[in-house]
Amino acid sequence: MRALIVAEIASNWEGSISKAKKLIKECKNAGADAVKFQMWRALDLYEGHPDWKIIKKSELTFKKAEKLKKYADEQNIEFFCSVFYPEAVDCLESLGVKKYKIASRTCLLNDNYSLETLESIAKTGKPVIISMGMGGNKKRIMKIFSKNKITFCYCISEYPA
């Protein structure tokens, strides 16, 4: 079995489509099989943060996701996301992503939309990569994704990384 090399772009594109496209191309040139972004809403996770304007600018909207997915396809590199709210699943499904990533904070089920987001992803039947770095109830997570192919990742969730 060949390892999947995923380049984590996350929010490092700072809301700039041109910067994101450059990163996608560089990831492809470096030999990555896939690029992964994060699809969250600033209001859900960062309301009141002192760097609100910068954070809000880095939000991956549906329109931006569509542009980046199209560009990744043109570069022949897979595009997928960590998803933090259920409507993002609908967006990514309309774009035809092949898999989903679940952040360890989502596995804690502490955020407003965590459970609903997990259930929305599970309903797609697509493979999921699940981080358990912050913990969470692995048995419950496995039950939610009983019909999906699951890959668990274990890491130290210490930021900045």
Pin down the residues of each PLM region.
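Catalytic cores and adjacent flexible loops of soluble metabolic enzymes
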Residues: 1-161
